Amino acid sequence: MKREHHYLHPRPEPPSVATGSNRESYLNTGKAKLWEEEVQLDGGMDELLAVLGYKVKSSDMAEVAQKLEQLEEAMCQVQDTGLSHLAFDTVHYNPSDLSTWVESMLTELHPPPTSHLDDSSFLAPAESSTIANVDYEPQLQTSSRIFEESSSSDYDLKAITDSAIYSPRESKRLKASESDTDVFSTSAIGASNFATRPVVLVDSQENGIQLVHALMVCAEAVQQNNLNLAEALVKRIDYLAVSQAGAMRKVATFFAEALARRIYRLCPENPLDRSVLDMLQMHFYESCPYLKFAHFTANQAILEAFEGKKRVHVIDFSMNQGIQWPALIQALALRPSGPPTFRLTGIGPPAPDNSDYLQDVGWKLVKFAETLHVEFEYRGFVANSLADLDASMLELRPSEVESVVVNSVFELHQLLARPGAIEKVLSVVKQMKPEIVTVVEQEANHNGPVFVERFTESLHYYSTLFDSLECSPNSQDKMMSEMYLGKQICNVVACEGADRVERHETLTQWRTRLSSAGFDPIHLGSNAFKQASILLALFGSGEGYRVEENEGSLMLGWHTRPLIATSAWKPGNNPVVAH
């Protein structure tokens, strides 16, 4: 199928890089601003340094370069004595004024003759670069939070509010550590012939706030078609991400890549090979409970719908490797009344190499069903899109003979890329007269028309997902799962039009769509909730996962943020009124 590539139409470049008092930044110090109001690029300031937040006139470049050389020489000269005299009580104001700031550093590096250098007074090593789950107030508190390395999975980007991003912050002091004697005493034994090297303090908390702010400003620049500014910010994001650890660094790197692809219009034209996608999804399945929860809750609803039925037929919109169905086959085999005849129709896209992967999956399921003495029929159905399906293609039998169930896990949102596609598919599903329709979707709104809002929502959502992955004990599964999610991030941020298929919507939005199409909700029973809770309890390192019931649907989230939702539906008796 031929695909079209759509991109946002360029918008007029704004008169300034940023306007309004609410754009005050955290970059560098409290009185420094990332972007001064009404910045004029031709006002004598060096443009590249201005983008990074430094005010340097082009005419002063030679003088600043000379001072930087002097600063480097001074730093080398104090290696034997350390930096204990540096900035005990001195506040360095406005480092955006690069010339004055470097000059103040030079002054600090030449202490008075009477100053006493204490061997134990070194700058403290940097704390963990992970930003913890902190509720930032509009004004940052004077006492900084200390972030331990063990809390790398506690970071929740959602906790960083817009007011925290743009409000002014108090000036910081650069202080020496009080415990450096213990830190360096062991290394001094037997190594006294080596000169003590100055320790550079990396404020990971500060950089983390700058990183979030740079991501947001870059998204705004992209939306305003200010691509020069956006390009410079992407480079800064990469620089700031290096100082972070764990989920924060990984999320920022994926979003920076996606922003760069959008800036340079490099949206991936060809999807990954089907085998690669299946491999990544399998690692995602193993590393965290999201897919397990999706399959388990859907299977529980299907099992209850099949109670007492002799012949059952599942139409799966998300066949992939068929990992959902062995558990259902086993549950049907254990029915007190005996297993029914089970027919499965698996639907999937064509493979790039034209291999019949759906048939291979079917053979594995047939062999598995034989071991459990379940009469099993399988048919694989290849379709470029679910919108290409017609009920007549599926060899449906009368409802008196065979009970039909339709299952969709993370598939329906892709139909939103094509106008009218979701309405057509839901109409076809209704023609199938299913006993139940199980739907699992991401609990997020990544389908809004405004790019900045979509970017912000996806940044919050995937930050939480990556945070939960930090609990995965298997590093290979975790790495592959991050690649799996990174592909989604790239599609949400970098692509537009028909190419943007990761159009996730919330449970509330899906309720509106399905109700408008003539479906009534089915409440998932309390048994499904209890069983899902047991599943999470058995999942290793799963203390942060939470199951909650929402008006008959079940949600799985990380701490307080729901991430996926399972709902069940049946065709309503009332006819759909066309609007």
From Swiss-Prot:
According to the UniProt record, where is the region Leucine repeat II (LRII)? 360-392
Gene Ontology biological process terms from the UniProt entry: gibberellic acid mediated signaling pathway
List the residue ranges of the region (SAW): 494-570
> Where does the motif DELLA motif lie?
46-50
One GO term of the cellular component aspect?
Answer: nucleus
Q: What does UniProt say on post-translational modification here?
A: Phosphorylated.
Q: Give the main location.
A: nucleus
Q: Where is this region: Leucine repeat I (LRI)?
A: 209-263
Where in or outside the cell? Nucleus
Which domain of life does this protein belong to?
Answer: Eukaryota
Q: Where is this region: PFYRE?
A: 404-491
Q: Per the record, which residues fall in region VHIID?
A: 281-346
Name the UniProt key words of this record, in alphabetical order: Gibberellin signaling pathway, Nucleus, Phosphoprotein, Repressor, Transcription, Transcription regulation, Ubl conjugation
- Show where the GRAS domain sits: 202-570
Motif window: VHIID: 312-316
Motif LXXLL motif, residue range(s) on this chain: 412-416
Q: What else is known?
A: Its mRNA transcript may be transported over long distance in the phloem stream. Such trafficking may regulate leaf development.
Summary of the function given for this chain in its UniProt record: Probable transcriptional regulator that acts as a repressor of the gibberellin (GA) signaling pathway. Probably acts by participating in large multiprotein complexes that represses transcription of GA-inducible genes. Upon GA application, it is degraded by the proteasome, allowing the GA signaling pathway.
- Which family does the UniProt entry place this protein in? Belongs to the GRAS family. DELLA subfamily.
The record's note on its domains: The DELLA motif is required for its GA-induced degradation.
Q: What is the designated name of this protein? A: DELLA protein GAIP
